[in-house]
Amino acid sequence: MNQKYSYIYNKVKSMVAKAMFSTLFPLLPLSMGISTLTSCGAEDSISRRFHCRFTFHTQNHPGNTLEIALNGFGTYTFVSASYKNNIWHIYSTPNDGRNKTEDIRITAAPELQYAKVYNLGANNGIIIGNSNFNKYRAYDRQCPNCIDQYGGTNFPLNWNSANRQQVICAKCHRIYDLEYGNIIDGADGSRLMEYSLSYGTATNGTGKVISVYN
């Protein structure tokens, strides 16, 4: 290559390198920012609008539908609690299409200490289960958008008969997907109020414990 063409080649090479650097360099902090926002978003997905505290010892209730929901895929159940005739009751209504509610009595002494401080979100109702991607999920059973629009906390979600891995609000007709808690049909708005859920062996090594909290 003669001197003239060598000069032109090096000049073009230098210009291309500068162009690539000027294009890519501004994207570096942007990509770092996106990564940071993503990790922060995961932490911020837990709702603290209403207090949630629920603990359930599965070993005292073999075959219970709460545990069945956590051991499946795309399986969920509505959970609520009440205190009647000096006994705590846990009610569980799975999305299995049978429309049956299990009544679980809490009578064991170790469980009663937890029952006294049950607080199941906005209006005594949560949804727990396991997603199709093996991710435990827990949501408030109230429609967050109707709470925002109308006030109060009496907007319970029910299973969508067309797809029981979804819930629907009778008031606003929004449909929420339980995989991620997002609105998949209806007006724009907030996703479901999500809570943390842990499911593991009890500290004393006897059986497993389900805990939902924020």
Model-derived features: positions:
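Bacterial N-terminal signal peptides that target proteins for export
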Residues: 2-27
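Short, basic, low-complexity termini and linkers enriched in Ser/Thr/Gly/Pro
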Residues: 27-33
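N-terminal pre-ligand scaffold of iron-sulfur
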Residues: 44-159, 195-214
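Short solvent-exposed loop/turn micro-motifs enriched in small/polar/acidic residues
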Residues: 121, 160-162, 169, 189-192
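Residue-level signal for mature regions of secreted extracellular proteins and peptides
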Residues: 33, 136, 162-165
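Conserved binding-pocket/active-site segment within a compact domain
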Residues: 146-179
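C-terminal motif of bacterial Sec signal peptides marking the signal peptidase cleavage site
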Residues: 35-39
